[in-house]
């Protein structure tokens, strides 16, 4: 299983494009990518989930922790283009209010 995290800059803020699977073997790559971007204290970091093919509960938990970490640094972490599966997982877990999701 693999995850590719590509960072680009846009008018909206820093965008981290994820492609592949987010699970216990790849969450560290996501964590490192987001923490590296938070170092510069941007107003917003967007995590683009449009090419994410799988996410398990550890992946969702990592996104929740990273959202809290970003908020503590006054950065908004936005999850963009989630799949229906990801949205269902968020709903079942009851964590939608803790995440900022953009379509």
Language model region names:
Residues 1-54, 65-103:
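STAS-like cytosolic regulatory interaction modules
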């Amino acid at each position: 299983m693999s995850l590719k995290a590509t960072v680009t800059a846009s008018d909206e803020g820093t965008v981290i494009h994820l492609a592949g699977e987010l699970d216990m073997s790849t969450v560290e790559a996501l964590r490192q990518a987001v923490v590296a971007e938070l170092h510069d204290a941007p107003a917003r970091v967007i995590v683009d989930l449009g090419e994410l093919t799988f996410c398990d509960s550890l992946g969702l938990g990592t996104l929740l922790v990273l959202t809290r970490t970003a908020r503590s640094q006054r950065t908004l972490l936005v999850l963009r283009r989630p799949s229906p599966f990801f949205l269902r997982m968020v709903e079942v877990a009851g964590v939608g209010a803790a995440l900022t999701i953009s379509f």
